[in-house]
Amino acid sequence: LHPFKKPIIKHSMSEKKLNLLADFPAVSAQEWMDKITADLKGADFNKRLVWKTNEGFNVMPFYRAEDIENFPTTEVKPGGFPYVRGTKANNDWFVRQNIVVTDAKEANKKALDILNKGVNSLGFKVDKNALSPEYIATLLDGIDAECVELNFQTCVRKSAYLMDLLVAYFAAHQYDVLKLEGSINFDPMNSMQLKGKKLAKDDVMEMAKNIVLSAARLPFYRVIGVNAVSHNNAGAFAAQELGYALAWGNEYLSSLVDRGVDTSLAAKKIKFNFGVGGNYFMEIAKFRAAKWLWALIVEAYQPACRRENCELTRDGICYCAMKMRLHAETSAFNKTIFDAHVNMLRTQTEAMSASLGGVHSLTVLPFDAPFKAGDEFSERIARNQQLLLKEESNFDKITDPAGGSYYIETLTKELAAQAWKLFLEIEDKGGFFAAIQDGSVQAALTATADKRLKDVSSRREVLLGTNQFPNFNEVAGAKVSPVAGCGCNDGAATLPVVRAAQEFEALRFATEAAARRPKVFMLTIGNLAMRLARAQFSSNFFACAGYEIIDNLGFASVEEGVAAARKAHADIIVLCSSDDEYADLGVQAIELTKGQEILVIAGAPACADDLKAAGAEHFINVKTNVLESLKGFNALLNI
């Protein structure tokens, strides 16, 4: 063919269009099941292919169109009630970065800088003792409040004062209040859970009423926070986070209405701050279900519409008030100190879940947040993770791509059912305030955190770089510094302060602090494939505690391997071979190491009982609890 001429193509059967539905016979669900059953060759379908989630429902290996027939979510369009597909027709979201304000002028300088780098939402954590008109003027100098979402957090007892300062500042600068968007994160119930403070409900709700009435002057400012992110950071499963959040929000809404606040106004002043974790599709479903269920809750109050010519008013009912305002922040629970750059991968998938799930705004925390304040590099990466999704991947141009997905629609429905069940349980017991007062919410989340830590310790829940495939030579060094606890606890129950990686990290910190780093020697011998596989497994196993790993290609005899281990001054010798060879090689290793090195046999051989009788004490395999085993070795090594 000439390189600059189109080839001549003769058309015949290729002109016929392929019709997949007509040209291929339909396959029924039963036919799929029959095929799967045959391929399993007698293995249990439920054990092998059905995912038993922590959310209280099972996930099947495949779904079909008939599985989502008559779902209440599938006929809804983006922007339509009950908003499962989003509260607006587009999927644009605010890119938020938080600033802890220690000096108003410096914070303003930083805010102006990052606004020129892609941020369009600012989160200021302000000092309650510094609040004044001059402080706000300095903090917001040069920032166009009509173009930037402004969010604030301060002491709950100063929140109403902060609201008044903002109203006065906006009026002085002649801003159009209909173009101002932002929030004040007033949430005393969050303080009760985090700090163990004992507050009276009447006092809390009276403060809430005052700030809501003050904020009525700013129609698009939300001033009541529902900080479900605190539950997420404490290890909550998605159904728990959502169910408690609904009860939390309803506690504020019902209490405000009971105190005479207009229902529509009260609902429009509540903002939900969720965490977003690494369970990718479940998180997308969580945000979809959250918008759906909150719309149903607010609808039950029949809020009256106060706006003239509102397109969403039906029979005088305000459907705008039923739209959840949803902010998301990447979870702290699954972030790690060691191999911290993996946190970038975690926050990237979390940002994807949140954006595809239709959040209003999103904060991606810097990858180094577990051990230090973000610096210029880590904050830039965190911003760019969102900008990449917008500018390169166009996630903001596609609204609810999960809509119609057999899998995600099913997850949404099932997760909503579990969350609704929990919501009703809380309501039946007197509401969310009562549940945190008696400590039942904190107790439930502590139990969940304990389960997740146990799953991490046994590798049922994997943290790359921490309990699986660690960086063998990484040293924490100056990464870790002590964190002072809050001194304002009144003795009430609190949420667990926990990260999934913390117990493994404690092992490595202890190893670093030891006088000498333990050496683990891989005595590889016999069957090539098995010895390599078990050496790799064992190396990863012991590296999780920060031990020095000495791997080897193989030895001709156990004697040669033990001699090499002693020459290397090994503390632990791991025998890596095949099950069939352990009956002989294991006994030899036991005799040669007795009373000197710690001998570990990699695997679960059939001859394990015989080896134990001969003196073997330590075996590691895929069923071993990694954390507890490593704690035991630390104890043997006096670490």
Describe the function of each predicted region.
Residues 13-279, 283, 304, 309-310, ...:
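Catalytic alpha/beta active-site cores
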Residues 211, 216-255, 345-423:
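Mobile "lid/hinge" segments at catalytic clefts and subdomain interfaces of large enzymes
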Residues 14-29, 48-51, 57-83, 360, ...:
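Intrinsic disorder at enzyme termini
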Residues 50-58, 185-189, 227-233, 268-277, ...:
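A glycine-rich phosphate-binding loop feature that marks nucleotide/adenosyl-phosphate handling sites
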Residues 1-12:
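Short, Lys/Arg-enriched N-terminal segments with co-localized hydrophobic residues
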Residues 52-61, 113-121, 342-368, 403-407, ...:
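Conserved phosphate/anionic-ligand binding catalytic regions in large, soluble enzymes, centered on
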Residues 249, 273-374, 381-382:
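Glycine-rich anion/phosphate-binding loop at the beta-strand->alpha-helix junction
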Residues 236-243, 277-289, 331-344, 372-382, ...:
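Short glycine/threonine-rich loop-to-helix capping motif typified by GTGT followed
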